[in-house]
Amino acid sequence: MSTFPAPVLGTPLSPTATRVMLLGAGELGKEVVIALQRLGVEVIAVDRYADAPGHQVAHRAHVVSMTDPQALRQVIEQERPHVVVPEIEAIATDLLVALEDEGAVRVTPTARAAHLTMNREGIHRLAAETLGLPTSPYRFVDTEQALREAIDGGIGYPCVIKPVMSSSGKGQSIIRSADDIAAAWRYAQEGGRVGAGRVIVEGFIEFDYEITLLTVRARGADGQIVTQFCEPIGHRQVDGDYVESWQPHPMSPAALQRSREIALAVTGDLGGLGIFGVELFVAGDQVWFSEVSPRPHDTGMVTLISQVQNEFELHARALLGLPVDTRLRQPGASSVIYGGVEARGVAFEGVAQALAEPGTDIRLFGKPESFAKRRMGVGLAVADDVDQARAKAARVSQAVRVRAGA
């Protein structure tokens, strides 16, 4: 096993500074910035739009098209970070691989992990074909006709279609019959992160529930890399986007063990240091791999209130080579606060009411612009059990009202 010298952290804005650059400064990136700031790290946040949540708390902020390799290289060379942390998928990952190969920068967890997980084809082929992990049956297709042939050739109905590059459920839909194919194809072409293109069609698995298993690769006190697991997180999605999550989700011992084995296999192959959000389907004691994100996961926002160290603190500590603590503090839940209006500079009402109940908290992300279904915040709650925590978190999010500013 590899060894590693004890980490030394510097002073921000000084010659000794430990510099970390985040590529992506949304609500998840913002929490990573805060976690790094608490450890005395100098943080540079990059996003495609001004005043992103992470921009508001970083030492320096840049507005850059992160899919433009020339622009991305320029900002990295300008800031000279010790570590680059991809916080979204829409990045010129070929450049990150090249820079890491050159020894110019360290990418967390690795540039290869960022590259493979930026589209569903890379990670599905790794999981199913290289590692032999159980997945839903799938095919990759480039035309509507090829989609029809894939479904008729064995995928069957119902099935799920997704762009190979998309996030938050964009472009994703269920095809229940041949009558749905044309509309589903158009929706997938509109929802892809880089426009029209390749899609994945997956056979439907009759699962009981799906979980996110936050998996952390970090160095122990002896410097060796060890893999640790948070308690499983259950979540509910609408149109492919998470609306609530809770921890822990009850599982059979056999299903939990199999989930950990799958997560260990895929994160071990991706390598590096940091947290991974491993998404799994579960039916009884059977477990199937779904997806993995080599970064904090949106469903993991429940850990802001449920764990000793939340997922953002775990990621920050791990990428710096520090030991981590994945223990659950108390059963908890999160519930999304949606914008509900289309406006800039919105105001939030009902915050005092939302926080009046003991064991609750909120995060307001500070996004400069609201849309009807844009996540603008999250309600958080802990309780004696998950069901009580879910009910409390829902009351928190429902109490907060978003209105257009004056």
Curated annotation (Swiss-Prot):
Similarity comment: Belongs to the PurK/PurT family.
Name used for this protein in its record: Formate-dependent phosphoribosylglycinamide formyltransferase
Pathway: Purine metabolism; IMP biosynthesis via de novo pathway; N(2)-formyl-N(1)-(5-phospho-D-ribosyl)glycinamide from N(1)-(5-phospho-D-ribosyl)glycinamide (formate route): step 1/1
Source species, domain of life: Bacteria
Any one Pfam family match given in the protein's UniProt record, by short name: ATP-grasp
Residues reported to bind Mg(2+): 279, 291
Function text: Involved in the de novo purine biosynthesis. Catalyzes the transfer of formate to 5-phospho-ribosyl-glycinamide (GAR), producing 5-phospho-ribosyl-N-formylglycinamide (FGAR). Formate is provided by PurU via hydrolysis of 10-formyl-tetrahydrofolate.
GO molecular function list: ATP binding; magnesium ion binding; phosphoribosylglycinamide formyltransferase 2 activity; phosphoribosylglycinamide formyltransferase activity
Keywords recorded for this protein, A-Z: ATP-binding, Ligase, Magnesium, Metal-binding, Nucleotide-binding, Purine biosynthesis
GO biological process, one term: 'de novo' IMP biosynthetic process
Catalytic reaction equation(s): N(1)-(5-phospho-beta-D-ribosyl)glycinamide + formate + ATP = N(2)-formyl-N(1)-(5-phospho-beta-D-ribosyl)glycinamide + ADP + phosphate + H(+)
Keyword Nucleotide-binding attributed: yes
Residue span, ATP-grasp domain: 125-320
Assembly and binders: Homodimer.
Binding residues annotated for N(1)-(5-phospho-beta-D-ribosyl)glycinamide, in chain numbering: 27-28, 87, 298, 367, 374-375
Coiled coil location: none
GO cellular component, one term: cytosol
Binding-site residues for ATP, renumbered to this chain: 120, 162, 167-172, 202-205, 210
